Structures are given as C-alpha cells and as structure tokens.
C-alpha cells in the first residue's frame, strides 16, 4: 500500500480563493477590507519568517495586515497596552500575538486580553469554551486547518478511533475537541502516557504534534490509517522534518501529510478565514 498524499498547499489555495472572493464581495458593497494586526516581539528568526509568510498571504487575498514589531525588552504591561490599542481600533478586525514570547512575559495573560471577537488564533478561553460547548466561533487555526484538510479524503470520520500524540494548548487539546465534534472516539497521548506504541497501533486516524523527529516509528502505524504529521523541526538550513518518517510511513498509511507542505499551509489559510469571519461580525 502506498498512501495518497494530503496536499496542504493545494487545499490551502482553495480556502484562500474562497476568502479572496468573499472579500471582493465585501468591497463591491463599499465595505472595508478585513484588517489584521500582528504583534511580533523580539528577533526570533523563525517567528519573523512565519510573520512574513502571513503578511504575503494576507496581501494575496486582500486582507490589510499591520505588523507591530516590539523589542525583546518590552514589559508585559507595555505589551498589554499595545493589545488594548488594537482592541479599540475599529479598523482592526483580528489580532494575532506571535508566539513564542520572551521568558519574562506570560502568554496566557496576554492571549486572554485580546478581545474574543478579534481572537483570530482561537486561543482565548471564550473561544475554546465555545468549542467545548459544541458552539464554535473563532477556532484554533492548526486544528481547524487539519479538519478542513481531512475533508479532502472524503472519508467518514464518525466512529473512527483518532489518536493524538501531543497535548499542547495550541494543537493537541483543541484538536481533540474538533475530533469529538466530528464524532470520533479520541485518545490523547502525552509525556506521561504508558505504552505509546500500543495506542498508536490502534489509531485509524493518527495526528502527531510533538516536534521531535522520529518519535513515531513507522511500524506502529496501523495499515490503512490516515496520518497527519503536525511536527516541524529544522534539522539544517535546507532540511525540515516532521515527527514521522514520511518515506516509510507512506507504505502503511492510506493518506498522509508531507512535511513541509501539509499542515503548515492550512494553518495560514485558516488564519485568513478567521480574519474574514471576525471582520464580518463588525461590518
């Protein structure tokens, strides 16, 4: 068995085309384009690259993006003031606080300070609570991007055993909520999980989000499973790896995402979708 490839780039282009068309329709009605404020703290090269990619994606679909670049020495209270300013700005429909932040700043306090209706990353307790209550509003970008990508398989997910490896607030936990909404039976594995291999072997849908290349051995993968690799590690300037060895895993899976070109483009596309959704609540 050779897996079919879940191409995140192709799926993301479909999402972006829909967003672009909806923005065009807004403009035809004389309404302003959605506005996104991105707050970037410090000089982390990876964060700067991600933000530049988001800027280009916004420009391509017609979203106005403004990047506020803050020094690494900024205090938590100063950063909170910038968020408050964006909250008040009627031309800003979405706010994104680029993570990670410097060690002296608590991200939880600042993410909670963003207005829930401008929280296009979907991390505010209000938006996560809506997801828990099965009444989603703005949804976390990577998990919802994965759900959109899964529609490309045309597989019925109801009743499937989904195993998530990784329990972060950004991916693992909201991913479990999304899969419960899709009527999957969900197992979440984390650093204290015993017999990880046995859990993985039972997965009809496997989603791995750890950031450790090779943490999942290909022989653990159930033949015919759908495999989503959210992991992203830069091994060298020209080499990027996921959490699973793609070449061997594709011989067991029915569908598999590549790294890069799988989940990453969907995260950005979902951010654009969320920004449009946030703008539509104001316009």
Curated annotation (Swiss-Prot):
Keyword Amino-acid biosynthesis: yes
Presence of keyword Hydrolase: yes
UniProt-annotated binding residues for NADP(+): 166-168
SUPFAM superfamilies for this protein: Aminoacid dehydrogenase-like, N-terminal domain, NAD(P)-binding Rossmann-fold domains
Catalytic activity: (6R)-5,10-methylene-5,6,7,8-tetrahydrofolate + NADP(+) = (6R)-5,10-methenyltetrahydrofolate + NADPH; (6R)-5,10-methenyltetrahydrofolate + H2O = (6R)-10-formyltetrahydrofolate + H(+)
One Gene Ontology cellular component: cytosol
Record-level GO BP terms: L-histidine biosynthetic process; methionine biosynthetic process; purine nucleotide biosynthetic process; tetrahydrofolate interconversion
Keywords for this protein: Amino-acid biosynthesis, Histidine biosynthesis, Hydrolase, Methionine biosynthesis, Multifunctional enzyme, NADP, One-carbon metabolism, Oxidoreductase, Purine biosynthesis
EC number: 1.5.1.5, 3.5.4.9
Subunit description: Homodimer.
Similarity field: Belongs to the tetrahydrofolate dehydrogenase/cyclohydrolase family.
PANTHER family with a match to the protein in the record: C-1-TETRAHYDROFOLATE SYNTHASE, CYTOPLASMIC, C-1-TETRAHYDROFOLATE SYNTHASE, CYTOPLASMIC-RELATED
The name this protein goes by in its record: Bifunctional protein FolD
Organism (species): Coxiella burnetii (strain RSA 493 / Nine Mile phase I)
Gene: folD
């Amino acid at each position: 068995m050779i897996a079919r490839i879940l191409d995140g780039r192709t799926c993301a282009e479909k999402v972006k085309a829909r967003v672009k068309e909806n923005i065009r329709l807004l403009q035809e009605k004389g309404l302003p384009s959605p506005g996104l404020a991105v707050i970037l703290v410090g000089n982390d090269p990876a964060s700067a690259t991600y933000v530049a990619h988001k800027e280009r994606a916004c420009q391509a679909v017609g979203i106005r993006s403004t990047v506020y670049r803050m020094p690494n020495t900024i205090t938590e209270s100063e950063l909170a003031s910038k968020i408050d300013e964006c909250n008040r700005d009627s031309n800003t429909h979405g706010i994104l606080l680029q993570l990670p932040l410097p060690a002296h700043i608590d991200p939880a306090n600042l993410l909670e300070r963003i207005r829930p209706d401008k929280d296009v990353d979907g991390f505010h307790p209000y938006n996560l609570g809506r997801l828990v209550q099965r009444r989603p509003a703005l949804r976390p970008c990577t998990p919802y991007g994965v759900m959109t990508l899964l529609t490309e398989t045309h597989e019925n997910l109801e009743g499937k055993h989904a195993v998530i490896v990784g329990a972060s607030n950004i991916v693992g936990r909201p991913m479990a909520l999304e899969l419960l909404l899709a009527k999957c039976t969900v197992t979440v594995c984390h650093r204290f999980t015993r017999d990880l291999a046995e859990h993985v072997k039972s997965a009809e849908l496997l989603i791995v989000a750890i950031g450790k290349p090779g943490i999942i051995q290909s022989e653990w993968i159930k033949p015919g499973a759908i495999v989503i690799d959210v992991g992203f590690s830069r091994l060298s300037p020209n080499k990027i790896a996921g959490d699973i060895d793609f070449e061997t895993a594709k011989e067991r899976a029915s569908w598999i995402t590549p790294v890069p070109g799988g989940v990453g483009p969907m995260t950005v596309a979902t951010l654009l979708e969320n920004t449009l959704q946030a703008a539509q609540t104001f316009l």
